[in-house]
UniProtKB/Swiss-Prot annotation:
GO terms for cellular component: mitochondrion. CDD domains: FMT_core_Met-tRNA-FMT_N. Gene3D superfamilies: 3.40.50.12230. It is linked to Combined oxidative phosphorylation deficiency 15: An autosomal recessive, mitochondrial, neurologic disorder characterized by features of Leigh syndrome and combined oxidative phosphorylation deficiency. Clinical features include mild global developmental delay, white matter abnormalities, ataxia, incoordination, speech and reading difficulties, T2-weighted hyperintensities in the basal ganglia, corpus callosum, and brainstem. Keywords: Disease variant, Mitochondrion, Primary mitochondrial disease, Protein biosynthesis, Transferase, Transit peptide. This is Methionyl-tRNA formyltransferase, mitochondrial. The gene is MTFMT. It comes from Homo sapiens.
C-alpha cells in the first residue's frame, strides 16, 4: 500500500502543509493495495524504459546522458529511450529533436507521445503541463530536471532570473511532476553550486545542464528508493520565474543602476538585445562593457551636470558612455538599421548632430526609455491597420 501511494502521489506532506485535493483517479489508486495493482510489466529494478520530454540545449544534455546510459550495456540502466519534443518552424527542429534524429532515437512531436509502454518519464525544459492521464501511464511517474533550487524560481526561466536577480547560489532539482501546476512536486535530489561572478545565463545554463544530467542518472540508478525518500517542497521561499518578454529588454535609464543593467545584459543579452530610444529611433545595444576608473576620471564626465540617458563618445577607449541612475555603462557596438561600432555610431550620428547643435548639452542628445506597446495594444493596432487596408 505505502509503495503504491508514493509512486502515484508522492511522499507524505510535511506537518501543517496543504495541498490541493487529489483527483478521483489518484484517490482510487491510493485505495488499492500494491498487490492488487501490480502489473507483471512493471519493473522493480533497471533497466528502465524511458520517455523523454524536452526542447532546448539544457534538455539536450539530459537526453545525451540518458542515451549514453542506454548505450552502456554493462551497466544496464536503460534499455528503451524515446523522445517527445515541440514542433519548430526550423526544418532541423529544436536541439532535442536534432540530437534524437542524429542518434536514431524514436521522436514524436507534441501532443503525440507515442503508444509504447514505459516505466518512467523524464522532463527537462518542456514548457507544457502534463495531465494526470499521461502521468498515470508511467508506473514510476515523471521526473523533472529543473535548473534551480526549488521552491526558488519555479517556472519557465529559472536560469535567467537567477542571473537577473544577482543570486550567488543556485543548483538543480530532480523532482516528481504533479498535474495542473509547474514545479511543485516532491524533491528527489537537489544539489547547489555557486554562481560564477559575472556569469551569463547561457554560461550558467551549461554548468547546470551537466550537473542535472549527472543527477538524473544517479536518481535512475536508485529510482524506487529515491521516490520513497522524496520530500515535499517547503512552503516558504517560493518564487516564480516567468518568461522574458521584449519589454524586459528596454533599459530604464532613470530607474536602473549600472549593476542592474549589466545583470540584465548577462541574463538576456544573447536572446534579446537590450534596447533604447534615440531621436525617435530604436537602438539595440549589442556589446556592453564596464567602465574603468581611468575613463571615469575624464574631466568631460565630471565637469558637467548629466541626467540619465546622456551619451558621450570616449575616443581613447572607443566606447559610448551612457549615464544611468548611479553611474556609467560602456557600449562597444549598437544596431541602428545595421550593426555599428561605437566609433561608427559617433561618426555617423552623434558627431553630425553636435555639429548642427553646437551649443547643445549631452542631455539633449540622450538615450531614452523605449516604451513597447502591450500585446493588447499591438493586436488592436494590427486590427485597425487591417480595417484601413
Amino acid at each position: 500500500m505505502r509503495v503504491l501511494v508514493r509512486r502515484c502521489w508522492g511522499p507524505p506532506l510535511a506537518h501543517g502543509a496543504r495541498r490541493g485535493r487529489p483527483s478521483p483517479q489518484w484517490r482510487a489508486l491510493a485505495r488499492l493495495g500494491w498487490e492488487d495493482c501490480r502489473d507483471s510489466r512493471v519493473r522493480e529494478k533497471p533497466p528502465w524504459r524511458v520517455l523523454f520530454f524536452g526542447t532546448d540545449q539544457f534538455a539536450r544534455e539530459a537526453l545525451r546522458a540518458l542515451h549514453a546510459a542506454r548505450e552502456n550495456k554493462e551497466e544496464e540502466l536503460i534499455d528503451k529511450l524515446e523522445v517527445v519534443t515541440m514542433p519548430s518552424p526550423s526544418p532541423k527542429g529544436l536541439p532535442v529533436k536534432q540530437y534524437a534524429v542524429q542518434s536514431q532515437l524514436p521522436v514524436y512531436e507534441w501532443p503525440d507521445v507515442g503508444s509504447g509502454e514505459y516505466d518512467v518519464g523524464v522532463v527537462a525544459s518542456f514548457g507544457r503541463l502534463l495531465n494526470e492521464a499521461l502521468i498515470l501511464k508511467f508506473p514510476y511517474g515523471i521526473l523533472n530536471v529543473h535548473p534551480s533550487c526549488l521552491p526558488r524560481w519555479r517556472g519557465p526561466a529559472p536560469v535567467i532570473h537567477t542571473v537577473l536577480h544577482g543570486d550567488t547560489v543556485t543548483g538543480v532539482t530532480i523532482m516528481q511532476i504533479r498535474p495542473k501546476r509547474f514545479d511543485v512536486g516532491p524533491i528527489l535530489k537537489q544539489e547547489t553550486v555557486p554562481v560564477p561572478p559575472k556569469s551569463t545565463a547561457k554560461e550558467l545554463e551549461a554548468v547546470l545542464s551537466r550537473l542535472g544530467a549527472n543527477m538524473l542518472i544517479s536518481v535512475l540508478k536508485n529510482l524506487p528508493e529515491s521516490l520513497s525518500n522524496g520530500r515535499q517542497q517547503p512552503m516558504e521561499g517560493a518564487t516564480y520565474a516567468p518568461k522574458i518578454s521584449a519589454g524586459t529588454s528596454c533599459i530604464k535609464w532613470e530607474e536602473q543602476t549600472s549593476e542592474q543593467i549589466f545583470r540584465l545584459y548577462r541574463a538576456i543579452g544573447n536572446i534579446i538585445p537590450l534596447q533604447t530610444l534615440w531621436m525617435a529611433n530604436t537602438i539595440k545595444l549589442l556589446d556592453l562593457v564596464e567602465v574603468n576608473s581611468s575613463v571615469l576620471a575624464d574631466p568631460k564626465l565630471t565637469g558637467q551636470a548629466l541626467i540619465p540617458g546622456s551619451v558621450i563618445y570616449h575616443k581613447q577607449s572607443q566606447i559610448l558612455l551612457v549615464y544611468c541612475k548611479d553611474g556609467w555603462i560602456g557600449v562597444r557596438s549598437v544596431m541602428l538599421k545595421k550593426s555599428l561600432t561605437a566609433t561608427d555610431f559617433y561618426n555617423g550620428y552623434l558627431h553630425p548632430w553636435y555639429q548642427k547643435n553646437s551649443q547643445a548639452q549631452p542631455s539633449q542628445c540622450r538615450f531614452q526609455t523605449l516604451r513597447l506597446p502591450t500585446k493588447k495594444k499591438q493586436k488592436k493596432t494590427v486590427a485597425m491597420q487591417q480595417c484601413i487596408e
